[in-house]
Structures are given as structure tokens and as C-alpha cells.
């Protein structure tokens, strides 16, 4: 998002305060006023919910795992991992997509049939907060890559370099969501928490949410003739032999 589309936590708190009839203050994040104390908590809740509401381009990150034959096949996820972007998992050394994420039942089937010595292409699942692959131990030198949504929706005030976290603890920190989006969502949260009607505020939020989720990334030209889309995982991008179960 552009630099002009974001603002500090203090500015967002004052912006929403004015909209709901509260006088702005110099440093709302340090204020002990009960209204601002409540708004600080709700601002963090709003940001956490927005992370999971849409695969925002600004939160996308790439993760890479290079395997060794000494690995267990269980890998720690990044500290800021929220969730994987579906169909972005690839094993790049052999240029094939990862199979998964597998359910518990499918995982039990793989292990029960013992395909470890067969030419099975890499399967994965998430369990116990870890990224697991099969077969395990894996072959040496696999290059496993996938995209994920980061929980780091809060940026530091200074760029030396910027750091990102999942919680606002100071008023000069900057939520990287569009300022109108997060302001309108905080307003909904605040009105709801204080028992006021949220109909208009919710409609305003829904409008900006729909606009931003529809325009933050490019889109293909629609073909009314039913043209073929690119099959990310299919016969055109996996080998003819040496894969599968």
C-alpha cells in the first residue's frame, strides 16, 4: 500500500475519536482515559482480524526449506506465520508442486502404506504448529518453497530497517493496512463495544473492504467464450512418471 494510505496508531485513534464525538488528545496511546484505553485494545483486535480476513498482498511472504538427509521431516514455521497461500507450495529442484495440505486420514494412509521407498512426490501437512513433509526423512537437497500470510501488520516508526510485529504497543507504530479500512473497522468495534448502533458504520466498512480486496491486485480479462485458465496443479506441470502414489 502507498505511503499516503497509512498512518500512525495515534492518528488512527484520534481520527476515530473525532468521528464518535470524542475530543482528540496529543498522545492517545499514552492516555489513561477509559475511552482511549478501550480503543487501543480494539485497534489490536481489529488488526488481528483483518490479517485473517483476506490474503493481503502487503502481508505475503515467501518461505524456503532446503532439506538434508539428517532431517526429521518436521520443520519450524516462521515466527510471523499466519496461514499458507493455497497452491503456492513447490519443490523447485524437481520443478513439481507439493501435494497437500493432507488431512490426518490421508497422512495416516501414507504412513500406513509406507511409500517412503517409492517415487512419491513430496506431500505436506500442518500439525502441532509445524510444517511436516512426507516421505521422512526426506531426500537431501530438496528446495521446498511456499507463500504465506504474515501476522506482521504493525510496522515500526523508523526505517533502520523497518521491523514488523503483530501488536501495537506504541502510538508512533504504523498499521500497514489502508488507513480508511482500519479506521472504519475500529469505529465499528468501538460503537459495538459501547452499545451504539453499528448499521451505518458497518456499511461504510463493508464498502471500503470490498473496494480494496477487489483492487489491490491485478485481474485477468474475463473471456465470455469460456477460455481455459492456467492449471496451477495438473498434467501440464508435473512429470509423466516418477510421481504420485
Language-model features and meaning:
Residues 1-245:
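Glycine-enriched, solvent-exposed interface loops adjoining structured elements
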Amino acid at each position: 500500500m502507498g505511503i499516503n494510505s497509512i498512518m500512525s496508531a495515534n492518528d488512527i485513534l484520534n481520527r476515530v475519536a473525532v468521528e464518535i464525538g470524542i475530543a482528540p488528545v496529543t498522545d492517545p496511546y499514552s492516555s489513561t482515559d477509559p475511552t482511549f484505553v478501550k480503543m487501543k485494545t480494539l485497534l489490536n483486535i481489529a488488526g488481528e482480524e483483518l490479517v485473517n480476513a483476506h490474503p493481503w498482498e502487503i502481508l505475503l511472504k515467501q518461505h524456503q526449506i532446503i532439506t538434508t538427509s539428517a532431517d526429521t521431516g518436521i520443520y519450524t514455521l516462521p515466527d510471523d506465520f499466519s496461514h499458507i497461500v493455497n497452491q503456492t507450495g513447490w519443490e523447485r529442484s524437481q520443478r513439481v508442486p507439493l501435494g497437500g495440505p493432507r488431512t490426518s486420514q490421508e497422512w495416516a494412509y501414507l504412513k500406513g502404506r509406507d511409500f517412503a521407498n517409492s517415487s512419491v512426490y513430496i506431500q505436506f501437512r500442518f500439525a502441532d504448529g509445524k510444517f511436516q513433509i512426507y516421505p521422512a526423512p526426506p531426500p537431501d537437497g530438496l528446495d521446498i518453497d511456499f507463500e504465506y500470510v504474515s501476522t506482521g501488520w504493525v510496522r515500526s516508526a523508523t526505517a533502520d530497517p523497518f521491523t514488523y510485529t503483530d501488536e501495537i504497543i506504541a502510538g508512533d507504530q504504523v498499521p500497514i493496512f489502508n488507513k480508511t479500512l482500519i479506521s472504519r473497522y475500529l469505529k465499528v468495534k468501538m460503537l459495538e463495544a459501547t452499545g451504539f448502533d453499528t448499521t451505518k458504520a458497518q456499511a461504510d466498512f463493508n464498502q471500503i473492504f470490498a473496494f480494496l480486496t477487489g483492487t489491490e491486485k491485478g485481474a485477468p480479462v474475463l473471456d465470455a467464450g469460456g477460455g481455459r485458465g492456467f492449471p496451477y496443479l495438473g498434467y501440464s506441470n508435473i512429470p509423466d512418471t516418477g510421481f504420485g502414489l
